[in-house]
Amino acid sequence: KKLLALVVAAGFAVLSTGCVKIVKIGEESALTGKVEFNASDSVSGLWEEARANIEGKAVDLPVFLQEAGGDLKSLADKYGKYSMGTSGSISYAVKGSGTVLEVNQEKKAGFMIVKPDGYDGPEIIKIQIGSIYKGSSTRDTLDIIDYGNYTNQEEWAAVSQELHSKIDTDVIQAADPTSLSGKTITFVGTFTADGNDELLITAVDLEVQ
């Protein structure tokens, strides 16, 4: 009886304390089976589809500005996409051509000022040239992804950052922005309607004529 009691007690102790497995930081996926999110791989996989999506919905910039009549948010239902379903910031996809009046790289958030062909309105048209890119209009304009495709806000933000990295490498630097002053360009891009005086466009396609 004493031996049986000892065996039972030992078994109870094992069940009570359980078995603890130490998992090293960075090796969690081996235990859980969950693959760590890689924003660079994610964006590389959707990049060409993303460009096609934006190019397919882009509105001619002169047409857009004329229809807006000085109120960029007024075309939200016709051309825009909200950042949060039916609310939040409004982003648009546009395309056009024009002459580069100025290339400004005094700050890291560089830009070009473009005089668009076919439009003489007061709005200032800027195209971002990096190295820092403001906003998230490229991501927010896309119809092929949304926040629900990602686990958390960190992943969603990382997608926007990687889109900007891809744009900087494949689109902007490939066009050698420092050499573009006075030249004619064509572009496809996105912008968020933050005001009515200025459009800050993030290009997904930029060609020098």
Q: Model-derived features: where do they sit?
A:
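OB-fold and OB-like single-stranded nucleic-acid-recognition modules
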Residues: L4, G18-Q209
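Sec-dependent bacterial lipoprotein signal peptides
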Residues: K1-T17
